Amino acid sequence: MKEYKTISEIAGPLLFVRKTEPVGYQELVNIVLSDGTVKRGQVLDSSNDVVAVQVFEGTSGISRDSSVKFLGETIKMPVSKDMLGRILSGSGEPLDGGPAIIPEKRLEIVGAAINPYSRRQPKDFIQTGISTIDGMNTLVRGQKLPIFSGSGLPHNEIALQIARQAKVVGSTEPFAVVFCAMGITAEEAQTFMKDFERTGALERAVVFLNLADDPAIERIITPRLALTTAEYLAFEHDMHVLVIYTDMTNYCEALRQIGAAREEVPGRRGYPGYMYTDLAQLYERAGIIEGKKGSITQVPILTMPGDDITHPIPDLTGYITEGQIVVARDLHRKNIYPPINVSPSLSRLMSLGIGAGKTREDHKAVSDQCYSAYAEGKDLRGLVAIVGKDALSERDRQFLEFADAFEDKFVRQGREEDRSIEQTLDLAWELLSMLPINALNKIDNKYIEKYHPSKRKK
């Protein structure tokens, strides 16, 4: 353990220390104040004779007389299966009044590198109970599928609903949720804690809560602690783990804040140039590994600044992940929950997780037909604004009515409503029956004969 009393500068959350011996990147540091108080930190830059240290608890109270001890190790996460049912802080400390975690192992939070050749193709359907996701943008086990939202939209409610309801239908294999909230207010933290406890979802979950007034460096660490926990449960205890993060925008803002404090050359809109690589380090920890029974599925949630989908955060996230679920402000204004706009939404792995033996044989065709009919109905709304409804043909009126009914019955559902995939597909058929059968050009006749409401009643 190396100890120095050579603090040369204090700038915001950073401490600069002159060194004489080599110091490791991301090495842990203890700063002992003159009154004996100990603060923790981490090495951010050790390339020069002056080491940059990010102080977790902030630099107030630190002076040139404070001593800096380099501990010779990086952050390790104490993990145990007993973490299920626990609520932890962004640094892994208990928030629920329970005892400290007695670790079975202490793991590096950066995670083990996964050989790309050893990854298995995702193929198992995860039912979230939300029709717009299950029916139109299916989540597959091992996938990373982000939710793009905006400020003031109910993405936290959607996150909680997915955490409560997500399951692999027909599977008896153990399923767990790791919920990671970053940069949230104390009020939001209370809401999350109460909801998990009220619904009983906490029994199969590990919850990490990083608050808005916690240090920026902790916000960088929190998702890595969550993913390390998920990897331990998945690959050591053969569990299928769903990791939900909210809000990745707060994480990226912390990256920008730390980059500015280090006086790095900024990239697009002031974010560090390595943000793509940093996000990939998190998202690429999802997947299924050959020879392991467990899996990790990720649902990162982010708020798009100014609802701009071309902003660097959603833009880079879209390059790394396998699709996106888009939460729309216009649907929210109509008081529709969840306000998920299926038109720009996409699940790139959907075709691998649906069909006979997984969901139902007609799933792909019904989804395609709903997309097509809804798009046509939305286009007709623009035409109605110009020429009026009376100028429409009977066929056009049917598509217009379908678009309204689709939003009101298929997209809209209760916050506690858990629809099975059969209920979702049957509801889609009920809505498609509003259209003439000859307009269902995306669906094979054998499925129309089997599932169309007018045929089933005979």
Swiss-Prot record:
Location (main, coarse): membrane
Superkingdom of source: Archaea
Signal peptide residue numbers: none
SUPFAM superfamilies: C-terminal domain of alpha and beta subunits of F1 ATP synthase, P-loop containing nucleoside triphosphate hydrolases
Keywords from the UniProt entry: ATP synthesis, Cell membrane, Hydrogen ion transport, Ion transport, Membrane, Transport
Annotated GO CC locations: plasma membrane; proton-transporting two-sector ATPase complex, catalytic domain
Location relative to the cell: Cell membrane
Entry keyword annotation includes Hydrolase: no
Positions of disulphide bridges: none
InterPro entries: ATP-synt_VA_C (IPR055190), ATPase_a/bsu_AS (IPR020003), ATPase_A1-cplx_bsu (IPR005724), ATPase_F1/V1/A1_a/bsu_N (IPR004100), ATPase_F1/V1/A1_a/bsu_nucl-bd (IPR000194), P-loop_NTPase (IPR027417), V-ATPase_su_B/beta (IPR022879)
GO molecular function: ATP binding; proton-transporting ATP synthase activity, rotational mechanism
GO biological process, alphabetically ordered: proton motive force-driven plasma membrane ATP synthesis
Membrane topology annotation: Peripheral membrane protein
Function: Component of the A-type ATP synthase that produces ATP from ADP in the presence of a proton gradient across the membrane. The B chain is a regulatory subunit.
PANTHER family the UniProt entry points to: V-TYPE PROTON ATPASE SUBUNIT B
Family label: Belongs to the ATPase alpha/beta chains family.
Subunit structure and binding partners: Has multiple subunits with at least A(3), B(3), C, D, E, F, H, I and proteolipid K(x).
Record-given protein name: A-type ATP synthase subunit B
